[in-house]
Design a protein with these regions (language model features):
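Conserved G/P- and acidic residue-centered "switch" motifs that form tight phosphate/ATP-binding loops
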Residues: 112
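Short cysteine clusters
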Residues: 109
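Ser/Thr-glycine-rich phosphate-binding loops at phosphate-binding pockets of nucleotides
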Residues: 116
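Cys-dependent protein tyrosine phosphatase-like superfamily
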Residues: 1-106, 119-175
Length: 175
């Protein structure tokens, strides 16, 4: 059975999905074919290279591209948060541009709850949602509470404060 996509509501022409990692190794080609049939245009992976290797997903980018989709890797360690506000801003702008252009995007991590929920919530906050509203909407879509950790929730509040113009030191990292 293919990895389930959890579709989220958002203000874009394209659609946003969260998912756990696709099945790897011999199943990877079938997984990417399934995601393409579901209408996915961009696969946004939050797995680290070590996780991808352990899960049989070293060739994920190759299989994604072979199906005519775009692949973006933005590694965040499991149960953690982005390590750079500038890098996450660029990643979120890329996701927002794809979604605004009508492209369908899936964001995945290992279980599709913590990191996927965090980045999806940050996208909604970027579009004007409060952190609470983003979490409520995405948790309902996912059928599980997102994001996974208190540190991820603190980071989402930190990101919302940055967008709201709150002055923070550029090197400030919330964990």
């Amino acid at each position: 059975m293919p990895t389930k996509l959890y579709w989220a509501e958002g203000p874009w022409r394209g659609r946003l999905a969260m998912a756990s990692r696709p099945r790897g190794d011999d199943w990877l080609e079938d997984e990417m074919a399934s995601w393409r049939r579901e209408g996915i245009d961009t696969v946004f992976s939050l797995l680290t290279s070590e996780e991808a290797k352990d899960l049989g997903l070293e060739d994920e980018a190759k299989h994604v591209k072979a199906r005519g989709m775009q692949f973006v890797s933005f590694p965040i360690p499991d149960r953690d948060v982005p390590d750079s506000d500038a890098k996450v801003a660029m990643a979120l702008e890329r996701l927002d541009a794809d979604l605004s252009a009508g492209r369908n995007v899936v964001i995945h991590c290992r279980q599709g709850v913590g990191r996927s929920g965090l980045i999806s919530a940050a996208l909604l906050v970027m579009k004007g949602f409060t952190p609470e509203a983003a979490i409520k909407s995405l948790s309902a879509s996912r059928g599980a509470s997102v994001p996974e950790t208190a540190g991820q929730r603190r980071w989402l509040d930190h990101y919302a404060a940055i967008l709201g113009g709150t002055k923070l030191a550029p090197s400030h990292t919330v964990r």
